[in-house]
């Protein structure tokens, strides 16, 4: 970890003001944390992170508390600053807009990696998980196929019981 530089009070206030301005949050400078909405808190945390001008930023569900406009602002901010971001996202509709590359993780293992359109296509998901429409799928496969709106020929909103090992993703 690089050493953080110590700032005097004036430099600290200036850095905070600049970070809030970059994130479009200048109006929040004098408010307490308790008075901020969830989305404002989320954006303030991101502003705090980017004011250190990192080369890499790891974001865990960065858009959870953001409305659609604020999500767009966040994507624009990250793109404008040119920071490399590793983002943990479960909102599959956001992934295509946010990511240049996608790693699909299943049970802690890398299941697929590539460009969003390629990884999130129905054919790639079926190939990756060797989805057989005549067997009961693993619950992860069901959730993924539903989230990606991939048409399937069987009902999936029923309890799934499974015997045997989980399918091994192809490489």
Protein language model features and the residues they cover:
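ABC ATPase nucleotide-binding domains
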Residues: 121-171
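Conserved ABC ATPase "signature" region
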Residues: 10-28
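Catalytic Walker B motif of ABC-type/P-loop ATPase nucleotide-binding domains
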Residues: 57-61
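A short, surface-exposed alpha-helical micro-motif characterized by mixed small hydrophobic
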Residues: 95-97
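Conserved ABC ATPase signature
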Residues: 32-36, 40
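Conserved catalytic motifs of ABC-family nucleotide-binding domains
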Residues: 53
């Amino acid at each position: 970890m690089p050493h953080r530089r110590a700032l005097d009070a004036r430099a600290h206030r200036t850095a905070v003001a600049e970070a809030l301005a970059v994130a479009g949050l200048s109006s929040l400078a004098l408010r307490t944390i308790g008075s901020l909405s969830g989305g404002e808190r989320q954006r303030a945390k991101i502003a705090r992170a980017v004011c250190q001008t990192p080369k890499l930023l790891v974001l865990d569900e960065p858009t959870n508390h953001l409305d659609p406009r604020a999500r767009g602002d966040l994507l624009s901010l990250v793109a404008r600053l040119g920071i490399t971001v590793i983002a943990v996202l479960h909102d599959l509709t956001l992934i295509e807009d946010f990511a240049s590359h996608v790693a699909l993780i299943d049970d802690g293992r890398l299941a697929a990696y590539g460009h969003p359109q390629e990884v999130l296509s129905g054919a790639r998901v079926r190939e990756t998980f060797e989805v057989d429409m005549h067997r009961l799928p693993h619950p992860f496969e069901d959730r993924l196929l539903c989230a990606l709106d991939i048409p399937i020929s069987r009902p999936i909103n029923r309890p799934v019981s499974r015997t045997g090992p989980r399918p091994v993703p192809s490489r």
